Amino acid sequence: MMLDEAVGRRVCCDGERGTVRYVGPVPPTAGVWLGVEWDHPERGKHDGSHDGVRYFTCRHPTGGSFVRPQKASFGVDYVTALKQRYEVEIEEVTAEEMKISSKTVVMVGFENVKKKQSVKNLTEVGLRRCEVSAPGPENEIRNTTPFVQSLDLSGNLLSSWEVLAAITEQLDSLQELHLSHNRLSISSAPSSLSSAFSHLRVLSINSCALTWTQVLHCAPMWQQVEELYLADNNITELLRPEHVLQALTVLDLSNNQIAQETVLEISHLPRLERLNLSSTSLSEIKFSDVPAGKKTTLFPALKELLLDDNNISEWRVVNELEKLPSLVYLSCRRNPLLHKEKNLETARQIMIARLGQLELLDMRQILSDERRGAELDYCKMFGSAWLRAGGHREAEKNNPNTDFMTEHPRYLTLIQKYGAPDEGELREQKPFALKNQLLTITFLCPEDLERKPIEKKLPGSMIVQKVKGLLHRLLKLPGVELKLTYTCAKMADREIEIDNDLKPLQFYSVEDGDKILVRWS
C-alpha cells in the first residue's frame, strides 16, 4: 500500500488500534510520520497539534499521536488471517501419528477430524482481533469459505462499510455478523451495499462509537436484520426509525447514556420482542396514551425488557410497565427502587404483585405459589391505605379515590381475585429499620409437650433453611428432618405449612407474635 493512500486506514501498533488522520513530515524531525487518532484516548498524547501546528483533529484532547510507518501494521486480508488462524489449528489437531517413548502410535479417526476441520467446510469463522483489513484477491473468500453462516470480525482493522461489504458479498449464506470494536467510516450510499448483507439476521456492532443517527443512516444496508446489538456506543438520543429496522425482534442499547424522553421513539417497532436498556441512566418511563390499569398500544410485541443498573427509584415506573401488553420477562436489578423496601425479597414480591403478566423476574421464574403469596401479601400491605382512600369490603360501597388507584392500579383486580383482606390481616408498611424487621416468634413442639416454648426475635428476611438450622441447635436435634407450620392470632384454628426452605419467613406472611410449630419424625 502506498502511504499517500493511508489516510482513513486503520492501523495497529503495540496492540492498540487507531485511524490514520495524517501522513507527512512533522518538523523539525526528518522523514514521514503517521498521525493516528487512537480508539482509546489514553494511548495518545495530544489532539493532533504539535509545536503550535495542527496536523489533524481528534475527538479527544489526548487521542492522537505520531508514529513511524514501519511501527504500524495495516493488517492482512481475510484469507491470510483465516489461514493463520485455522491452518495452524488443523496442523496441530490432525497429525496422523505421534511419537510416544520412541514408538509410533497411530491416531485412529483423525482423518475424519481433519475433514471436519477443513477450512472450506466451516460454517462459523472467528477472526476476532486478527488484524483483518481487506478482502484479498477477487472471489478468493467465496472459494475458500463458501458455507460460512456466522462470522466474527470484532476488533479488526476494517476501515469502512465498503471494505466490509467486499468481504460479506462473497459469503452467500452469512446470517450472523459480529463487528464490535471496529471503527467503520459511514457509507455515503448505504442502500447500494444492501446486497452484501441480504441474508443477515444478527448484527453485533457494540463499541463502534456510533450515534443513533448513524445507525439509522446505515440501516438500509441490513433491512432483514432481526437482532441488533448496539451496546456501549455514542447513542445519546433516539429518533423514530422510518422504513428501517422494521424486522427487529431484539435490540440492545445498553451502556448508552440515552435521553429518557426519547425512548418512546422506538416504541412503534412492530416486531420488537426483547429490548435491553440496562445502564442507560433511565429513571422514568411513561405511557401517556392510556390511564393506569389499561394497556398501551406502544411496544405491542415487547416480551422481554432489561432495565438493570439504572436510576429507577419510584414504584410508579413499575406501574407504567404493567401497561405493556405482552411483557412477561423483566430484569430490574441494581436500581435504587429495590433499596426502598426492607430487603430485596420484599421488593421482588411487590414487583410481582404490580406486574400481573410477569413470568420471569431478574432471571428467576415466578411460580404460581410465589405469585399467590406475593399478591396476598400486597393486599394486606396496602389494605389500610385502600380503606382510607374510600375502599370498602362491600362491592357497592368500594370506591377508592384516583390517587390510590394511580398508585395501586392492580389493587381492585387483586381483591376481586382473592377477596378483600380482613381487618385483622391489615398491616402497614413500616419504615426501613432493623427493629421493624425483627419478628418475635414463639416455637412450639406440639408432639413433645415436655419441651418448653422458645421465644426468639428473627428477621422476616431469614430463609426457612436457616430457621431450621437454628432449631437443630436449640432443640439439639442434629440431622433430623423438621416440618414447620405456623399459626397466628387472626386464624388461631388454622395451621399454615412452611414448605419451601429457600423462601424467607415474610413470604409466608409470618408476623410479629406468631407461633411456629415444629415437628419431626
UniProtKB/Swiss-Prot annotation:
CDD domains in the record: Ubl_TBCE
Protein name: Tubulin-specific chaperone E
GO biological process, any: tubulin complex assembly
LRR repeats: 147-168, 173-194, 199-220, 224-245, 247-268, 271-292, 301-322
Domain named CAP-Gly: residues: 24-68
Similarity comment: Belongs to the TBCE family.
Gene transcribed to yield this protein: tbce
Record note on quaternary structure: Supercomplex made of cofactors A to E. Cofactors A and D function by capturing and stabilizing tubulin in a quasi-native conformation. Cofactor E binds to the cofactor D-tubulin complex; interaction with cofactor C then causes the release of tubulin polypeptides that are committed to the native state.
Organism phylogeny: Eukaryota, Metazoa, Chordata, Craniata, Vertebrata
Gene3D superfamilies: CAP Gly-rich-like domain, Phosphatidylinositol 3-kinase Catalytic Subunit, Chain A, domain 1, Ribonuclease Inhibitor
InterPro entries found in the cross-reference section: CAP-Gly_dom_sf, CAP-Gly_domain, Leu-rich_rpt, Leu-rich_rpt_typical-subtyp, LRR_dom_sf, Ubiquitin-like_domsf, Ubl_TBCE
Membrane-spanning parts: none
Disulfide bonds: none
Keywords: Chaperone, Cytoplasm, Cytoskeleton, Leucine-rich repeat, Repeat
Subcellular localization, as worded in the UniProt entry: Cytoplasm; Cytoplasm, Cytoskeleton
LRRCT domain span: 335-377
Any one of the GO CC terms: cytoplasm
